[in-house]
Amino acid sequence: MSLFYPTRDEVREFFFGLWAKSRAGEALTPLESMALAIVLEHPEYHEVLGDPERHREREWPPEAGEPNPFLHLSMHLAIEEQLSIDQPPGIREAVRRLEERHGSAHEARHATMDCLVEMVWQAQRNAAPFDNATYLDCLARKL
């Protein structure tokens, strides 16, 4: 799996595999451990992760109103990676302040995810680089 640009199938296999490994009590890599902590906060996705044959090719169109679990978990993982290296600089402090406001680290991550999704969409739509300053401004507006 490419660490920076995984395919849809690679992302799904990563989450299916880590769920199976965790259920079997197998050792996890540091990245898998980080991802497992996120998965454990989302029991609504455990059935999906436990049944790869049924869900490997499943689509979650936005108009259906049900979030794509793999996209959601991947966004959480991206945020945790950003926080671990404070990239963009200042995100740790911004998310810490969101945690205070929301009273929950998980809810702060969801608020952060709203901004991250918007920034990725803008970058793709405009064929432009990710705008760190606008991302941090979006987080500040959530306070």
Where are each of the predicted segments found?
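N-terminal leader/targeting peptides and immediately adjacent processing regions
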Residues: 1-46
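Short, solvent-exposed positions on alpha-helices
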Residues: 29, 47, 89, 106-110, ...
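Aromatic-anchored, charged helix-turn/loop surface patch used as a conserved interaction hotspot
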Residues: 31-99
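Helix-rich interaction surfaces within compact, conserved domain-sized segments
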Residues: 113-119
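Glycine-rich, aromatic-bearing surface loops/beta-hairpins
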Residues: 121, 125-143
